[in-house]
Amino acid sequence: MAEIHNGGELCDFMENGEIFSEHSCLNAHMGTENTGDTYDCDEYGENFPMLHNSAPAGETLSVLNQCRKAFSLPPNVHQRTWIGDKSFEYSDCEEAFVDQSHLQANRITHNGETLYEQKQCGRAFTYSTSHAVSVKMHTVEKPYECKECGKFFRYSSYLNSHMRTHTGEKPYECKECGKCFTVSSHLVEHVRIHTGEKPYQCKECGRAFAGRSGLTKHVRIHTGEKPYECNECGKAYNRFYLLTEHFKTHTEEKPFECKVCGKSFRSSSCLKNHFRIHTGIKPYKCKECGKAFTVSSSLHNHVKIHTGEKPYECKDCGKAFATSSQLIEHIRTHTGEKPYICKECGKTFRASSHLQKHVRIHTGEKPYICNECGKAYNRFYLLTKHLKTH
């Protein structure tokens, strides 16, 4: 069993990695000393160390070596779960329990009683330890400070993971491709790219995701939730990075410049995607037809042509679309909204991509260059048409 301490940090039991939420188990976890006293188990021939803590006065704890769980009663009580003995029966539901405390908890459930109430959130708990955990969550106790940036954390393990952002350490390596990660959970999600496993499925449209965070973000499309709001204009977004990009529209900040054509971008990722226009690199390839794309989002949208998936439906006319951006653009045909304005001539557009193409008329930008003869065009379809002449 992992070291048990009274420092406020919750740790798990190393034998099986479980973290226990039951009253007795949590008390055992928070115990501080081994008294040296033991209970003898006649059934398994094991000795059980007696623990004690500073929680309820006089309460003693013991650990059952057979399954490595900790309990506030002698091991013989827990042994009933191993031999099937349930001596305490509740008449209302005819359910049997191995000890008096579980019987009491069941009675409380039927009677609707709650012994411990959390004032901050109004939640009520049957066990005092569950209440104690809730209190800790509300007090947001963060005793672990990063000496590099001053950020505080609730657990030392969180601080350890955070420190890797400063040191650059990435100890978790993918055996398939060699990519490294700062935390194990990121590696677990990444590995699913190779295995194709997507255990998190959207109940609305059936789309599946490799990670829980991906599903959480996706669900906002259906619920309309936009938790990230701009303090300047009140505009809200369902992704934090979209809010970050939006902030730059107020400052007109575009710090990332293309060395080939001089065009500036708000983020390094936008510059990276743009640069592929010049290099011709298209790393994202469709497994169905072989078509390649410069950005992953374009491939993702393209794949829906093969699957026929159109999860985004217009509530006004019922027309369905493969992407949320296509739906948003379509809705503007009903509302007449054209939020994208050309600063040169005042012409308005429904989509930002339409504005971008239009602006090239004023700037003379021709980013699509023929590798054969060097002739350049402001539209990709014009370059495609030209290539046929060669």
UniProtKB/Swiss-Prot annotation:
PROSITE patterns named in the record: ZINC_FINGER_C2H2_1 (PS00028), ZINC_FINGER_C2H2_2 (PS50157)
Gene Ontology terms describing biological process: regulation of transcription by RNA polymerase II
Main location: nucleus
Compartment annotation: Nucleus
Superkingdom of the organism of origin: Eukaryota
MF (Gene Ontology): DNA-binding transcription factor activity, RNA polymerase II-specific; RNA polymerase II cis-regulatory region sequence-specific DNA binding; zinc ion binding
Keywords: DNA-binding, Metal-binding, Nucleus, Repeat, Transcription, Transcription regulation, Zinc, Zinc-finger
C2H2-type Zn finger ranges: 88-110, 116-138, 144-166, 172-194, 200-222, 228-250, 256-278, 284-306, 312-334, 340-362, 368-390
Ranges in coiled-coil conformation: none
Pfam families: zf-C2H2, zf-H2C2_2
Entry's Gene Ontology cellular component terms: nucleus
Biological role: May be involved in transcriptional regulation.
Family, per entry: Belongs to the krueppel C2H2-type zinc-finger protein family.
Protein name as it appears in the record: Zinc finger protein 121
